[in-house]
């Protein structure tokens, strides 16, 4: 029984953009809410990898830096004062006889809740580090796996290895301020948005594809140049650089959640149009969710979060209204 413990109406696992907006909407539905985040700060992948990237796929916002978006989402989420728990990875899931769900963290702390919203993105993210014996020597010096501050690359000769959307975006962001930007990709086709790839190819960015990194050349703790190899001909070339950025993708893992009995499809958590999973009282929103015609944009997640909250409210109180009143009429908001 959970009668001797504080029980929340909703516990949101994940403090990224979707989890934060869902926390705000929980307040709109007058639900006692807790947010549990694995990282030491809120913001998820946006704060971790794209703090200065300009996000342009949210209606009404022509462009906003990732960290500014997170700042505004945190301010919005704080409106109804949800409890925030950082630095805890949820590993255990148990349902008590009275229906209360017990979430246990890897630190052994237990969280009691009536419903759960999974806003975990693609799970825990770890970068694929460079497969080179010398990589660890240079990591944190001038070998980078993410671009935290664009200005740190100002007037520098930068080489980026990678061909996904993140690598392309970094190239476009750095091109106006760096002395030079060179992008290496092992395939001729790039994985970024067509418009972003076209912008990169029109710019001063030197695009070398198909090429791969062959060797890091340096003394002490800094890389001075890289040897690259044309994948078809095998011809090598040496490029001098100031900074090397690696974006070879991520290791993505739902971790212990895979053992909770959730239905997994294509590496994500299967949901219906109400964001319900196959487990009663457990809902999902954002990149973690999989359903037909899923829109993989932050804007899409901003719809899924409130949908999951409304479903949680209906689960707790079948007689409740289907959705919250509009924010323009909410007494707490209009009096601020």
Swiss-Prot record:
Binds 1 FAD per subunit. Transmembrane segments: none annotated. Pfam families: Pyr_redox_2 (PF07992). Keywords: FAD, Flavoprotein, NADP, Oxidoreductase. It catalyses: 2 reduced [2Fe-2S]-[ferredoxin] + NADP(+) + H(+) = 2 oxidized [2Fe-2S]-[ferredoxin] + NADPH. InterPro entries: FAD/NAD-bd_sf, FAD/NAD-binding_dom, Fd--NADP_Rdtase_type_2, Ferredoxin-NADP_redctase_2. It is an enzyme of class 1 (oxidoreductase). Its EC number is 1.18.1.2. FAD binds at residues 37, 45, 50, 90, 125, 287, 328. The keyword Aminoacyl-tRNA synthetase does not apply. Its cofactor is FAD. The keyword Iron does not apply. GO terms for molecular function: ferredoxin-NADP+ reductase activity; flavin adenine dinucleotide binding; NADP binding. Homodimer. Belongs to the ferredoxin--NADP reductase type 2 family. This is Ferredoxin--NADP reductase 1. It comes from Bacillus velezensis (strain DSM 23117 / BGSC 10A6 / LMG 26770 / FZB42) (Bacillus amyloliquefaciens subsp. plantarum). The lineage of its organism: Bacteria, Bacillati, Bacillota, Bacilli, Bacillales.
């Amino acid at each position: 029984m959970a009668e001797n413990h504080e029980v929340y109406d909703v516990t949101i696992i994940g403090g990224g953009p979707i989890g934060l907006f869902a926390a705000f909407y929980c307040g709109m539905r007058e639900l006692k809410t807790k947010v549990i985040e694995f990282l030491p700060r809120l913001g998820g992948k946006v704060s971790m990898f794209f703090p200065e990237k300009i996000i342009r796929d949210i209606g009404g916002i022509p462009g906003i830096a990732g960290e500014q978006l997170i700042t505004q989402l945190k301010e919005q989420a704080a409106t109804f004062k949800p409890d925030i728990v950082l630095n805890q990875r949820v590993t255990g899931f148990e349902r008590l006889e009275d229906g209360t769900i017990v979430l246990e963290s890897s630190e052994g702390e237990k969280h009691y809740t009536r419903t759960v919203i999974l806003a975990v993105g693609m799970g825990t993210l770890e970068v694929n580090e460079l497969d080179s014996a010398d990589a660890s020597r240079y990591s944190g010096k001038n070998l980078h796996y993410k671009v935290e501050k664009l200005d740190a690359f100002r007037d520098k000769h930068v080489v980026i290895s990678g061909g996904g959307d993140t690598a392309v975006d970094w190239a476009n962001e750095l091109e106006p301020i760096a002395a030079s930007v060179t992008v290496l990709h092992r395939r001729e086709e790039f994985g970024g948005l067509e418009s972003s790839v076209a912008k990169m190819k029109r710019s001063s960015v030197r695009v070398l594809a198909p090429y791969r990194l062959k060797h890091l050349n340096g003394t002490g703790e800094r890389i001075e140049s890289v040897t690259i190899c044309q994948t078809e001909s095998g011809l090598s070339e040496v490029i001098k650089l100031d900074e090397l950025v690696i974006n070879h993708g991520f290791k993505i893992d739902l971790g212990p959640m895979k053992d909770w009995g959730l239905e997994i499809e294509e590496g994500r958590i299967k949901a219906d149009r109400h964001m319900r999973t196959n487990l009663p009282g457990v809902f999902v929103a954002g990149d973690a969710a999989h359903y037909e015609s899923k829109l993989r944009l932050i804007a899409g997640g901003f719809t899924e979060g409130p949908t999951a909250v409304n479903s949680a409210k209906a689960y707790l109180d079948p007689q409740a209204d289907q959705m919250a009143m509009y924010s323009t009429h909410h007494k707490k908001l209009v009096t601020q």
